[in-house]
A protein has these predicted regions:
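Bacterial N-terminal signal peptides that target proteins for export
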Residues: 4-16
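Bacterial N-terminal signal peptides
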Residues: 14-26
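Sec-dependent signal peptide cleavage junction
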Residues: 24-39
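Acidic Gly/Asp/Thr-rich repetitive segments characteristic of extracellular carbohydrate-active
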Residues: 53-83, 89
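Extracellular beta-strand/beta-solenoid scaffold signature
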Residues: 67-71, 90-92, 111-124, 143-153, ...
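Beta-solenoid repeat scaffold
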Residues: 81, 92-110, 120-137
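Leucine-rich solenoid repeat scaffolds
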Residues: 357-391
Length: 391
């Protein structure tokens, strides 16, 4: 009996030891918390944590509380993924840090103001990086939309916005990119709200440079941020964009010091998009030295009396000092359906410099002013205009 009890004790000791070792192994090999651990902030549970970097957001019950809780989750620069699994309200902008992914699915995020913004601290493309937004219906609480910017991203690189629907007033911007390098916008819908003023020229997708007048919000942060830095390597694919203007790469209309070669945008690609303008051009690429527009439907509904604003697809150098003419800088307009007023497709330089190489081919272009104005390519060192159908 004594031997038997001794053996039992030995077995219990071995079992206990193995249990401790196994527990330690699991503790070290996985995480220091159980799956779906609760993440708390200000004494409230705000998320279930599925791994060190994945959070399933739990609504707090108030718009301000949701915004504070989400900003707590997204504001660091560590890699993290936040899943929004409910329709929620926020009172103002979310401010993500670097290396942030927000998965919103088909859920609606309604804000008392805008929805996404970053505040750069230096005039560098690397100041803010690695933001991905997947899905979501992003809107303002007003039925007429925000008369401002819903998503403003500046001095940033490696930005991706996919399958998002963004509502904004005609006089605002659904997405505004200021001095960005390396942005992909894919599968998104930018939808205007409210009434479109007859002379409105605001675009739902704005590709901008950083100057005091084009980016007053940045200027208020620091005048040093507004040095004329342009945007480059911007890709817009499989999107539907409608607005007073649809998509525009902007230039500083009243700031001649920022209309120089170093302030020109470059490498803008727009493919497989449906773009509509109601009171200005559907698609306007100003002061852009290299661009590709392919497989798009571009429609301007602007009255002819609006003159240049009634052009369907415009690519233009505005007055100032443009880049040296080089055939390395290409503008390619291919396989699009373009409907305009004064012109369908219009490529023109208002400076002493010409475009480098311009290719306009396999398009179907229409101008309400007459067939001869369907396609006009002026001021190009080398141009190929071929296999187009005009009306």
């Amino acid at each position: 009996m004594e031997k038997f009890m001794k053996k039992i004790k030995q077995l219990l000791f071995i079992t206990f030891t193995l249990t401790i070792i196994t527990g330690l192994f699991c503790f070290c090999g996985n995480t220091s918390y159980a799956k779906n651990a609760k993440k708390a902030y200000q004494h409230k549970v705000i998320a279930y944590q599925d791994s060190p970097a994945i959070y399933d957001f739990i609504p707090t019950g108030s718009a301000a509380g949701n915004r504070r809780a989400l900003n707590h989750l997204i504001s660091s620069d560590k890699p993290k993924i936040i899943n929004i699994n409910n329709d929620i309200s926020i009172d103002t902008y979310l401010r993500p840090g670097n290396n942030t992914t927000i998965n919103a699915g088909n859920h609606t995020i309604t804000s008392g103001s805008g929805v996404i913004i970053n505040a750069p601290t230096a005039a560098s493309y690397d100041n803010f990086k690695n933001l991905t937004i997947n899905g979501g219906v992003w809107k303002n609480s007003s039925s007429s939309g925000l008369k401002g910017t819903m998503m403003r991203i500046s001095y940033a690189s490696d930005i991706s916005i996919n399958d998002a629907t963004v509502y904004c007033n005609y006089t605002g911007h659904g997405i505004e990119l200021i001095a960005c390098n390396g942005v992909s916008i894919n599968g998104c819908k930018l939808i205007p709200q409210g009434k479109c003023p007859k002379k409105c020229v605001e675009e739902q997708l704005q590709i901008d440079l950083a100057t005091p007048k084009t980016a007053p919000g940045l200027y208020r942060l620091s005048p040093k941020l507004c040095n004329g830095t342009p945007s480059k390597n911007i890709s817009v694919t499989n999107c539907t964009v409608s607005g007073a203007r649809g998509i525009c790469a902007s230039f500083p209309g009243s700031e001649s010091k920022y209309r120089k070669a170093g302030n020109y945008h470059s490498n803008i690609t727009i493919e497989n998009c449906n773009i509509t303008g109601k009171s200005a051009e559907a698609l306007a690429l100003f002061n852009t030295k290299s661009a590709t527009v392919k497989n798009c439907r571009v429609t301007t509904k602007t009255p002819l009396k609006r003159n240049s604003y009634s052009v369907g697809l415009a690519v233009a150098y505005q007055k100032g000092s443009s880049p040296k003419t080089s055939i390395k800088n290409k503008v390619v307009i291919e396989n699009n359906i373009v409907k305009g007023g004064r012109q369908g497709i219009f490529i023109f330089s208002h400076t002493s410099k010409k475009f480098g190489k311009v290719i306009v081919k396999k398009n179907r272009a229409y101008a309400r002013s007459g067939k001869r104005n369907a396609i006009r390519v002026i001021s190009a060192k080398k141009k190929q205009v071929s296999k187009n159908k005009t009306k």
